[in-house]
Amino acid sequence: MKNVKLSNTFFLLLLACLLLFSFKTQQDLAPEQIDWDTHFLANPDRRSPYAALTVTNWHYSYNSKISGNNLHIDFKFTGGVVPDRSWVKSERIANRKISRQLLNHEQGHVNINYLLLREGEQQVRFQRYTISNYKRLIQANANRVSKYYSEMQSRYDVETKH
């Protein structure tokens, strides 16, 4: 009877740990919400016809370990807004309604970048790699996803008449 009780306790503890560590942070669950004061710190490009520019990025890195014929790869993915390269022309957002509309448009770029980060992680992390092809395929998968989302960012500007 004691073993059954111990097994139940162990099972509940294990389940609680799994649930606790399976939750992701808010940052992982949704794109970051931008605002003018925090995310647009660079000096505006006065030659640009645009009122604002949101610069985003995504990076991946990995460490690989080969042991015999076994390949183990640990990936890390990061991305988001680059405030020191993003800018807004403050005189162009003096009107509150225009400011909200423009910030909403720029948020769209952040949302697309978030999709890139999530899709990039899926496309790069969950592939079948071999010792002989992993470096080439990781790079090729990342380049393919980056190109797709770069084109999506451009289409977004065209479609929203930015």
Predicted regions and their residues:
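Metalloprotease/metallohydrolase-associated module, dominated by Zn2+-dependent proteases
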Residues: Q27-F77, V81-S90, T130-H162
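Mid-length scaffold segments of soluble, non-membrane domains
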Residues: G80, D84-E121
